Amino acid sequence: MDIVTLAEVAGNLNVVGYGLAAIGPGIGLGILIGKTIEGTARQPELGSRLQTLMFLGLAFVEVLALLGFVLAFIK
C-alpha cells in the first residue's frame, strides 16, 4: 500500500468515528427528554424543576459529544 491509500483509509476511519461520536449522545438526548416529559406528565407541579435538571443534563451530554469531535481533530 502506498502512502496516499493509507491516508484515504485513515480519513474514512475518522468519518466513521464522527458518526459513532454522534450516535451515543443522540440516543442519550432522546432518553433524557422523553423521561423529562414522562416525569412532568406524572407530576406537573415538578415541571420547572425537571426542566432545569434536563437542561443541565443536556449540557453534559453535549459536552461529551463535542469532546468526541474535538479529539478526532486533535489526532
From Swiss-Prot:
Annotated GO MF terms: lipid binding; proton-transporting ATP synthase activity, rotational mechanism
Subcellular location: Cell membrane
UniProt keywords, alphabetically: ATP synthesis, Cell membrane, CF(0), Hydrogen ion transport, Ion transport, Lipid-binding, Membrane, Transmembrane, Transmembrane helix, Transport
Any one GO cellular component localisation term in the record: proton-transporting two-sector ATPase complex, proton-transporting domain
Annotated site (Reversibly protonated during proton transport): 62
Cleavable signal peptide: none
Transmembrane region(s): 13-33, 54-74
Entry membrane topology: Multi-pass membrane protein
InterPro entries: ATP_synth_csu_bac/chlpt, ATP_synth_F0_csu, ATP_synth_F0_csu_DDCD_BS, ATP_synth_F0_csu_sf, ATPase_proteolipid_c-like_dom, F/V-ATP_Csub_sf
Database matches in Pfam families: ATP-synt_C (PF00137)
Quaternary context: F-type ATPases have 2 components, F(1) - the catalytic core - and F(0) - the membrane proton channel. F(1) has five subunits: alpha(3), beta(3), gamma(1), delta(1), epsilon(1). F(0) has three main subunits: a(1), b(2) and c(10-14). The alpha and beta chains form an alternating ring which encloses part of the gamma chain. F(1) is attached to F(0) by a central stalk formed by the gamma and epsilon chains, while a peripheral stalk is formed by the delta and b chains.
Primary role: F(1)F(0) ATP synthase produces ATP from ADP in the presence of a proton or sodium gradient. F-type ATPases consist of two structural domains, F(1) containing the extramembraneous catalytic core and F(0) containing the membrane proton channel, linked together by a central stalk and a peripheral stalk. During catalysis, ATP synthesis in the catalytic domain of F(1) is coupled via a rotary mechanism of the central stalk subunits to proton translocation. Key component of the F(0) channel; it plays a direct role in translocation across the membrane. A homomeric c-ring of between 10-14 subunits forms the central stalk rotor element with the F(1) delta and epsilon subunits.
Family of the protein in this entry: Belongs to the ATPase C chain family.
PANTHER family, per the entry: ATP SYNTHASE LIPID-BINDING PROTEIN, MITOCHONDRIAL, ATPASE PROTEIN 9
Name this polypeptide is given: ATP synthase subunit c
Species annotation: Bifidobacterium adolescentis (strain ATCC 15703 / DSM 20083 / NCTC 11814 / E194a)
